[in-house]
Amino acid sequence: MSKLFNSLALLLIVLSFASCQEKKAEANVPKWILSMVSDSKNTSAEADFSNILSDKSVPYIGYIGTDYQKFSIDIQKVQRTDDNQYNVSGITVVKNNRCNFRGTIDIVENREFTHPTYGVDDSMKGQFKRRGCSIAKYNLEEETSQTGSGVFTGYLLFYWYENNDGKFVYDDIDSHSDSYCNNQYAGTWKSNKTKKSKLCAWGQYRVPNSGDLDIGAGEFSVNPKYAKNGWEK
């Protein structure tokens, strides 16, 4: 009887610890991400996400600063270095200033959606094992020798699905949806020269944590009051 009691006590301790760890992890994740993963649970995903992180199906849309100055980024290379870390490199552009950057993306959590949808007319039903997303931290350092360089830090959320062959694929199942987005980055940029920080975010189709910048219903559309900040065509 005492062995059974001890086993139950140990199980409760383990479950309590796991619950505390999950709550602690969630406490560090930005609210904008938590709101997008509410219908999901922790999962394991032994996969190389390089193909998703380097996706170029559409260019990134981004901003920097409280005036929502247009920010462009081209992620040119992504290479997995261990189970949860990726080396990345590319180019950023703000106004006429270009910088090269290198850095890392570290996956902190993989999640599986508990009530996945199946696309238009359920066309993807039976075509995948599960749909999910990954939460990651990023640290991207622009070359210090270049004018206007700095360091980007923040969180990233990207979506995937595992097909019936066990391959993890860029999730565009809901691309017909007005709110569809993928590869969402949001955080800050800190100037190497002044050490001052600015908000900075970018993503595919939509931009996370962007206040009233995007007023589009069916697709991204810039608020006219910010058009002069690099958004005019």
Regions found by a protein language model. Name each.
Residues Q85, T92-D106, F113-P116, F128:
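Mid-length scaffold segments of soluble, non-membrane domains
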Residues I173-S179:
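Exposed beta-sheet edge/beta-hairpin loop segments within beta-rich domains
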Residues A201-L213:
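Short beta-strand elements
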Residues S16-S19:
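C-terminal motif of bacterial Sec signal peptides marking the signal peptidase cleavage site
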Residues D82-V88, D165-Y170:
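Short linear interaction motifs
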Residues M1-L8:
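Bacterial N-terminal signal peptides that target proteins for export
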Residues A25-D74, V88-T92, D122-T144, G148, ...:
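Tryptophan-anchored aromatic micro-motifs
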Residues Q76-V78, T104-V108:
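Short beta-strand micro-motifs enriched in acidic
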